[in-house]
A protein has these predicted regions:
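Anion-binding alpha/beta catalytic cores of soluble intermediary-metabolism enzymes, centered on
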Residues: 1-167
Length: 167
């Protein structure tokens, strides 16, 4: 419960310190920390949580705003992305029934570099959350070069960049 969390005052202090250059006051932080999205992000930032599951009841922008403000991106990753985790009853698909789909909600048309970073970040998510070595698939509407199009080229280039980033 954000209103009665035992570390609420500590998180408020963190918020003020991190956002002081933006003029964050203790009063503003006291109001924001009552939002579970902000509390979750501050718990992650402080090492009190490993992640946050959200988005079903909140707009993507509302979910990402606290993360942009307090957590930032991992080293070497300049773009924020989301992931969907599906756990199937039929264990023959994915990794023992687990599939992770990258960024179906944040970037409608990522650049090749952004697409590569999304793939690398999602692979990290698979290792951290799923505990398995992921197999990455980049999808386009071309099968083994059957179509020539700039969107197909972007996926090919993104695949090469991702392989260079995480061999």
């Amino acid at each position: 419960n954000p209103k009665s969390h035992e570390k609420k005052d500590h998180y408020i202090d963190m918020m003020v310190e991190i956002r002081k250059s933006k003029g964050m006051t203790r009063e503003e932080a006291s109001l924001l920390i009552e939002d579970p999205l902000y509390l979750g992000v501050l718990m992650i930032k402080n090492g009190d949580a490993d992640g946050e599951v959200s988005g079903a009841d909140h707009a993507t922008g509302d979910v990402l705003r606290p993360a942009f403000q307090y957590v930032k991106t991992a080293p070497g990753i300049s773009v924020v992305s989301g992931a969907f985790i599906m756990i199937l009853q039929d264990k023959k698909f994915g990794e023992d029934g687990v599939l992770i789909f990258a960024d179906g909600a944040v970037h409608p048309n990522p650049t090749d570099k952004e697409l590569a970073e999304i793939a690398v970040a999602t692979a990290h998510t698979a290792r951290a959350i799923g505990g398995f070595e992921p197999k990455i698939a980049m999808l386009s509407f071309s099968t083994k070069g059957s179509a020539e199009h700039e969107l197909v080229d972007k996926v090919v280039i993104a695949t090469k960049i991702a392989q260079e980033m995480a061999p």
